[in-house]
């Protein structure tokens, strides 16, 4: 994919940066266009560096060992939550071992699909949730990680693909609120 980066590099302006895209005009984009600029593109990296962490340094492995953070435990996949977040609720469907999505077999894919649907429904049923956004980013620990982010009802500016950027700027949700929601999600996942 070197040609992809070459094509992108050919599109940079005089300042060495790509022009801002149409997303900056969206009403849900979290930043004002004025003064905003893209970072300069980095060099091509192939092979890519190994970003997996040793189990002793892995936050996902640590979370899997904490009963208060585990919402559902299966043999191969689990549903966990972060210790804190800035949204009404966040859940992660993760592999118990350092196993990315492309290493799951068909049974793992079936289990993942069921857990996405069940976890989505559990979060969507929480009071005050307007929608649940589902995404997959597994670029850090070596675990499969599908993230489900609960958007608060009526806060339309947080709609869409910028929810994670907004969440990074919002104040922390009180722990007691997260704990109460975790109990409801845990019960919903256990009920099936």
PLM regions and their residue ranges:
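Glycine- and small hydrophobic-enriched segments that form the cores of compact globular domains
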Residues: 73-79, 101, 111-114, 139
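C-terminal helix-cap and adjacent tail motif
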Residues: 17-18, 28-35, 152-192
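Active-site helix/loop of acyl-thioester processing domains in fatty-acid/polyketide metabolism
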Residues: 110-126
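A short glycine-rich, hydrophobically flanked beta-strand micro-motif that places a catalytic Asp/Glu
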Residues: 127-140
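A short beta-strand motif that forms the metal-chelation/ATP-contact edge
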Residues: 144-151
């Amino acid at each position: 994919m070197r040609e992809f980066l070459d094509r992108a590099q050919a599109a940079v302006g005089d300042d060495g940066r790509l022009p801002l895209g149409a997303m900056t005009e969206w009403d849900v984009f979290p930043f004002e266009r004025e003064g905003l600029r893209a970072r300069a593109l980095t060099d091509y990296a192939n092979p890519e560096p190994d970003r997996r962490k040793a189990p002793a340094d892995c936050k996902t492995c640590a979370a899997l060992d904490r009963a208060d953070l585990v919402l559902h435990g299966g043999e191969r996949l689990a549903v966990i939550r972060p210790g804190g977040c800035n949204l009404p609720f966040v859940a992660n469907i993760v592999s118990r071992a350092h196993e990315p999505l492309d290493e799951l077999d068909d049974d793992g894919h079936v289990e993942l699909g069921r857990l996405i649907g069940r976890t989505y429904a559990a979060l969507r049923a929480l009071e005050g949730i307007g929608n649940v956004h589902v995404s997959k980013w597994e670029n850090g620990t070596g675990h499969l990680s599908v993230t489900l982010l609960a958007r608060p009802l009526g806060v339309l500016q947080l709609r869409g693909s910028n929810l994670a950027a907004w969440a990074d700027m919002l104040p922390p949700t009180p722990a007691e609120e997260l704990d109460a929601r975790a109990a409801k999600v845990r019960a919903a996942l256990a009920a099936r």
